[in-house]
Amino acid sequence: MTKNIVITVDGPSGAGKGTLCYALANRLGFALLDSGAIYRVTALAALQCKADLTNEAELAELAAHLDIEFLPEAGEVKVMLGGEDVSGLIRTQEVADAASKVAVFPQVRSALLQLQKDFATPKGLIADGRDMGTVVFPTAQVKLFLDASAEERAKRRFKQLQNKGISGNFDQILAEIKDRDFRDRNRPVAPLKPADDALLLDSTTLSIEEVIAQALSYIHQKVKI
């Protein structure tokens, strides 16, 4: 077995990265890193200690000392901060808004870059994000880029909301996804793009089982587990 295997899964919002990464971590027995959640946890910690969201140095110092864990459990991933389950707390709009402010600071991104790198262990790691294969783990043994059309991702999001009993506007969801795609792909620092050596997986017309099967097949071609 290859030591310290890192498998990166990048892609836009709503492509199914979270579901794929959970399945891969579960089946391979690897640790899991959700980089998007890390920025939300940083924002939550900043709000809890009433940090100044415009003070880059203060936020970077806070980010450098966060104790974050991701625990796959019963079909979902628990996000732990200092031993406390904050999975629900980081999904609020207040935290999402704060995370977008925190993420623009280079010093914060630098601190969190090192924190993310530290997740790589002999156990193996599945890293879920937007710049895992290009910035955080450029030498990862396996790189995947999961994509889907904006329309399909909007349909999935709309269905998720319906299943939760939440009313949603499809056109608004689609517009938000397209807007986020534009921002992610055109940001000056770590724009969303496939690594040159990544396998591109388009999930637009695939079931999650088919995506998982293709990913596992490629992983076993690349590394011995």
From Swiss-Prot:
<dbReference type="GO" id="GO:0005524">
    <property type="term" value="F:ATP binding"/>
</dbReference>
<dbReference type="GO" id="GO:0005829">
    <property type="term" value="C:cytosol"/>
</dbReference>
<keyword id="KW-0547">Nucleotide-binding</keyword>
<dbReference type="GO" id="GO:0036430">
    <property type="term" value="F:CMP kinase activity"/>
</dbReference>
<dbReference type="Pfam" id="PF02224">
    <property type="entry name" value="Cytidylate_kin"/>
</dbReference>
<keyword id="KW-0418">Kinase</keyword>
<dbReference type="GO" id="GO:0006220">
    <property type="term" value="P:pyrimidine nucleotide metabolic process"/>
</dbReference>
<dbReference type="InterPro" id="IPR003136">
    <property type="entry name" value="Cytidylate_kin"/>
</dbReference>
<comment type="similarity">
    <text>Belongs to the cytidylate kinase family. Type 1 subfamily.</text>
</comment>
<keyword id="KW-0808">Transferase</keyword>
<dbReference type="InterPro" id="IPR011994">
    <property type="entry name" value="Cytidylate_kinase_dom"/>
</dbReference>
<dbReference type="GO" id="GO:0015949">
    <property type="term" value="P:nucleobase-containing small molecule interconversion"/>
</dbReference>
<dbReference type="InterPro" id="IPR027417">
    <property type="entry name" value="P-loop_NTPase"/>
</dbReference>
<keyword id="KW-0067">ATP-binding</keyword>
<keyword id="KW-0963">Cytoplasm</keyword>
<dbReference type="GO" id="GO:0036431">
    <property type="term" value="F:dCMP kinase activity"/>
</dbReference>
<protein>
    <recommendedName>
        <fullName>Cytidylate kinase</fullName>
        <ecNumber>2.7.4.25</ecNumber>
    </recommendedName>
</protein>
<feature type="binding site">
    <location>
        <begin position="11"/>
        <end position="19"/>
    </location>
    <ligand>
        <name>ATP</name>
    </ligand>
</feature>
